[in-house]
């Protein structure tokens, strides 16, 4: 007899296949506006600016993309975990250390979930945090410069997916193990996963200036910890993590990890965890992980850390509780009041809504249904506030509009479902094109949603854009939510694979944007603050070029006396003190990238010449009518040559020094 679960899966797969097949036909724009009306609502006139910044993860690009809403225009890409040749990020000597890990230099990661820092549960626009999923890391971006300021590696973890969700006053960002592994690592059979694998929940402290430090970790059963959100209001001091694969399968998880009707939300009382750490109940355990940050000289530095504090739920009681949740839950989303915790069960037929107040009552009355590794399992009926019936096939994530409604992304049936927090009934639904993953409402995960729009982050586009070979772009779709019914306004392509996004009013940060770096405050030891200071210095086989750039020349721009086998360091300082006048630098044969140097900034490129000859360098970033003339030459002589090291001073020919 066929198991009912398999019937559900077969039906879901059939619907999914039908949805993809429908992609070959021109879809009916159900819920959309007439083209002229939609265009008017997203049109931003020349010279005018968007209302919102949207920060979207790049997924496998490893970076963050910045868009404007409602226009959908792409403004910038911010390199985070991946080397980015356009800006020399991860190539210049001042940025390479940001990509250090306990595994060495790792110039890529899988960036999933951006989160804006918060004050009183409301986005404040100071920093943006984002996780690296592959080599477990969390990065912090400075939203005044739109640059990566810090990256911390997370030890004892694998697959940092439930991250870096922020607590209401940015006390912590969190991380969690998606792929449970032996902790500490050791050589054991994969078949002993149940006995030897563990998952860890990590709490990373955020200091007043944003500096991150690993505060403590909580050892958990070897499940897969998927997503998280912190509580707010009455649930402040708690964080909620979804788990799947409570079966602890280790092969063919699409079947093995879907046997049980319910998995869990792990409700973590991080205030209680703090108490246990203060009481000395945590065990300081050897660990190896990198902490990288940009120091006050604007140079990235790296420090290897050697231990972490690990808490055991059996020793720190009343710290963690499991809330049974159907089935393979993905999102763990807390409504603006902090009362409701919504889980999107990827294989569930309902959308469960847990009540924080009921959970507290259940804990007080010990309404337990056993335990898992010493962690109490609360009875489902004791915590559930209600279930949203017929949410669609494959509900994933929920955001909130602040007006009493939740909006849930539904992957298999490709739709957004709007439902009421009062009676848990669906009030509207609208198709997406196609296979929505995350969705985002500006501030929709906070105590004060800004509302107005919901953005669908779609995995598949099929017929939506001009084809681009075997791989098609992924997309975002903008819907208006200021009325009773959702209305499709705009499609726009995205960079990489945006798993999640955050949007905040531009007014929060637009006036705080740094326009240039004050040259007088440049503390880089390789800085050259005037053309008169430009020079070339040999130290053995190293040649250091202390160079300046200003519209429209380099100083020096002719250099002789470099030899094959030398290592040449070009320390370039941009002397400009004006907004949006970066200077680039590239030289023939460099095996790294260009430099892109902001006004008042210093960056260093390493070049190792292997051939005799004369090699040009030039500015790669257009800056003036004489941009083409912004160039120079380096003469490379044979190793051991007697050619003297010479360079030209401003306005002179070479050899005039």
Regions found by a protein language model. Name each.
Residues 537-567:
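N-terminal edge beta-strand
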Residues 515-548, 624-657:
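Extracytoplasmic/periplasmic copper-protein system
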Residues 78-81, 110, 152-157, 216-223, ...:
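Surface loop/turn motifs at the tips and blade-to-blade linkers of beta-strand repeat domains
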Residues 41-43, 86-92, 108-120, 156-166, ...:
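Repeated scaffold domains used in trafficking and secretory/extracellular systems
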Residues 69-73, 143-147, 203-212, 267-289, ...:
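Short loop/turn segments immediately following beta-strands, especially the blade-tip
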Residues 144-264, 271-273, 280-296, 300-324, ...:
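Asp-box/WD-like beta-propeller blade repeats and closely related beta-sheet repeat scaffolds
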Residues 40-52, 113-116, 125, 175-197, ...:
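Short, conserved, GDST-rich strand-edge loop motifs in beta-rich repeat architectures
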Residues 56-59, 122-123, 128-134, 173-185, ...:
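Conserved beta-strand positions in repeat-built beta-propeller and related beta-rich domains
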């Amino acid at each position: 007899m066929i198991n009912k679960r398999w019937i559900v899966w077969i039906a879901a797969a059939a619907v999914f296949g039908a949805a993809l097949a429908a992609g070959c036909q021109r879809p009916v724009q159900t819920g959309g506006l007439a083209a002229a009306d939609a265009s008017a609502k997203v049109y931003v006139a020349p010279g005018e600016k968007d209302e919102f910044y949207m920060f979207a993860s790049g997924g496998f690009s490893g970076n963050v993309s910045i868009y404007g809403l409602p226009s959908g225009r792409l403004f910038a890409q911010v390199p985070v975990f991946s080397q980015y040749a356009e800006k020399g990020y991860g190539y210049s000597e001042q940025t390479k250390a940001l990509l250090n890990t306990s595994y060495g230099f790792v110039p890529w990661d899988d960036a999933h979930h951006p989160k804006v820092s918060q004050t009183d549960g409301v986005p404040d626009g100071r920093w943006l945090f984002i996780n690296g999923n592959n080599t477990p890391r969390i990065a912090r971006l400075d939203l005044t410069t739109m640059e990566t300021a810090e990256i911390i590696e997370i030890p004892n973890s694998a697959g940092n997916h439930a991250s870096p969700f922020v607590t209401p006053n940015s006390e912590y960002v969190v991380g969690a193990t998606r792929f449970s592994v032996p902790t500490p690592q050791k050589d054991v059979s994969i078949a002993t996963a149940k006995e030897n694998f563990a998952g860890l929940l990590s709490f990373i402290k955020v200091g007043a200036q944003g500096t991150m430090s690993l505060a403590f970790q909580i050892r958990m059963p070897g499940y897969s910890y998927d997503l998280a959100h912190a509580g707010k209001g009455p649930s402040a001091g708690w964080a909620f993590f979804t788990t799947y694969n409570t079966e602890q399968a280790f092969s063919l998880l699409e079947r093995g990890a879907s046997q049980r009707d319910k998995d869990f939300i792990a409700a973590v009382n991080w205030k209680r965890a703090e108490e246990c750490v203060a009481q000395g109940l945590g065990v300081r355990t050897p660990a190896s992980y990198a902490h990288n940050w940009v120091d006050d000289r604007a140079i990235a530095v790296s420090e290897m850390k050697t231990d972490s504090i690990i808490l055991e739920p059996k020793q720190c009681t009343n710290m963690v509780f499991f809330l049974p949740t159907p089935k393979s839950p993905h999102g763990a989303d807390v409504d603006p009041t902090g009362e409701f915790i919504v889980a999107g069960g990827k294989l569930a037929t309902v959308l469960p809504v847990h009540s924080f107040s009921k959970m507290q009552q259940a804990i007080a009355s010990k309404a337990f249904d056993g335990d898992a590794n010493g962690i109490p399992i609360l009875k489902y009926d004791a915590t559930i506030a209600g279930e949203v019936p017929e949410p669609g096939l494959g509900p994933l994530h929920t955001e909130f509009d602040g007006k009493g409604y939740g909006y849930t992304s539904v992957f298999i049936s490709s739709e957004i479902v709007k439902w009421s927090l009062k009676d848990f009934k669906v009030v509207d639904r609208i198709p997406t094109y196609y296979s929505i993953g995350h969705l985002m409402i500006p501030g929709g995960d906070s105590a004060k949603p800004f509302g107005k729009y919901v953005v669908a982050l779609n995995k598949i586009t099929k017929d939506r854009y001009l084809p681009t070979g075997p791989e098609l772009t992924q997309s975002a779709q903008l819907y208006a939510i200021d009325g009773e019914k959702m209305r499709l306004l705009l499609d726009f392509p995205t960079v990489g694979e945006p798993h999640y996004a955050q949007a905040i009013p531009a007014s929060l940060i637009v006036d705080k944007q740094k326009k240039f770096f004050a040259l007088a405050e440049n503390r880089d030891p390789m800085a050259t603050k005037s053309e008169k200071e430009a020079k070339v210095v040999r130290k053995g086989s190293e040649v250091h070029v202390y160079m300046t750039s200003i519209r429209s020349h380099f100083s020096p721009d002719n250099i002789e006396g470099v030899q094959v086998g030398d290592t040449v360091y070009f320390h370039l300082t941009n002397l400009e003190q004006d907004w949006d006048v970066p200077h680039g630098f590239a030289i023939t044969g460099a095996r790294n990238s260009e430099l892109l140097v902001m006004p008042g900034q210093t960056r260093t490129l390493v070049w190792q010449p292997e051939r005799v000859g004369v090699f040009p360098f030039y500015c790669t970033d257009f800056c003036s009518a004489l941009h083409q003339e912004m160039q120079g030459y380096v003469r490379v002589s044979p190793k051991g040559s007697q050619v003297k090291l010479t360079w030209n001073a401003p306005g002179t020919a070479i050899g005039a020094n």
